[in-house]
Amino acid sequence: MKAAIAKYIEYLRSVRNASPHTIVNYESDLQQFVAFLMPPGTPEPSFSSIDHRVIREFTGHLHDLGLQKSSIARKLAAIRSLFKYCVRMGMRKDNPARLVAMPKLPKRLPSVLSAEELNTFLDQFTEIAAAATPVRRENKRCLSSPKKPSPARADARVLVRRDRALFEFLYGCGLRASELTGLNLTDLDRQEQILRVRGKGRRERVVPFGSKAQAALEAYWPVRIDLIRAGADRQRRLRNTLPPEPEAIFLNYSGRRIGQRSVGRLVKKYSRLANMDWDLHPHSLRHAFATHLLADGADLRAIQELLGHKSLSTTQKYTHATIRQLMEVYDKAHPRA
C-alpha cells in the first residue's frame, strides 16, 4: 500500500505536473487512509484485500471525527484517484472506491462583494492599515525610514505597501493565492503590465494588470529590495537561517517568498481592520474579479482565459451569481415583486 502511494505521488509530480498544493493534500489524505488501515501494532494489510467495505468504513470514521462533507469528499477523491492509477498500471484489477458514493455537497454560489465596496476598501487601504497598532514585530530589524521610529512600527508601515500590492493583484488579476505566491520576476513585464501565471496543472496563461496594481507595485518595489537586503543581513548574523529568495515578487519579512497561509491571514486581517461584516478570503477577490467583469459585459470565454479555467462550465457559475444578484435587486426595487 505504501509503495503504491509513493509511486502515485511521484506520478502526480512528474507526469501530471500537479501543483505542490494538490500533491501535499493528496499525500496527506492517503497517509490518513493508511493510518486507518494500520492501527498501532498491526501489520500492513495486503493491497488486494482492500475493498469497498473498508473504504466505506473509512468514510464513516471520518464522519465520526466531525469532518465536513467537503473534506470527506476530497479524501475519497484521492483514494479513487490512487486506485484508478493502480488499475492503469496493472497493480489492481478493479477500483473499489468507485463503489463508495461521494457525499452530497450543497451547491453554493460564490458570495461576492460589490465593485463599489471593494473600490472603497482598496482606495482607503492605507488609512485602514494606519489605524491599526501592530500586535507583534514582523521583523527584528528596522527597514529604512528617515525618522527611524520603533522597529515594529516601521516594519508595519512599509509592509503595508506590500500588502496593498498583494490585494491589488489578487483582485485586479483574479489570481489564486497559490498563483500569487508563485510569481517570479521572470513572470512580470512592468512596462507592458502583464503577468505570466502558472495555474492548476501547471497551465500557463497571460494576464494583464491595470494602473492601480501598477502604482501599488511601484510603491512596493523599494520595500521589496529592503526586504531582500534585511534577509541577507539576517542570514549573515544568524546560523541556520534560510537565504532570501530575490527571484520571488512577493516576500515576507525575511526576504523569502510569502506563503499561501500568510496571504490568507493578511486578507482576514485587513477585512477585520476595515470593520466590515465580510467573510473575506483570497478566493473572494478572485470571485469578485470574475463577477464584476461579467456584470460589465465581458465575454464569458475571455473570463475563462483570464481565470485559467480548463472548462467553461467552471466559469459559468459566475453567471448564476450575477443572476442571483439581479433577482435580489428586483425583489427589493420592483413594485410588483
Task: Indicate residue ranges for each PLM-predicted region.
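Conserved catalytic core of the tyrosine transesterase superfamily
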Residues: 1-337
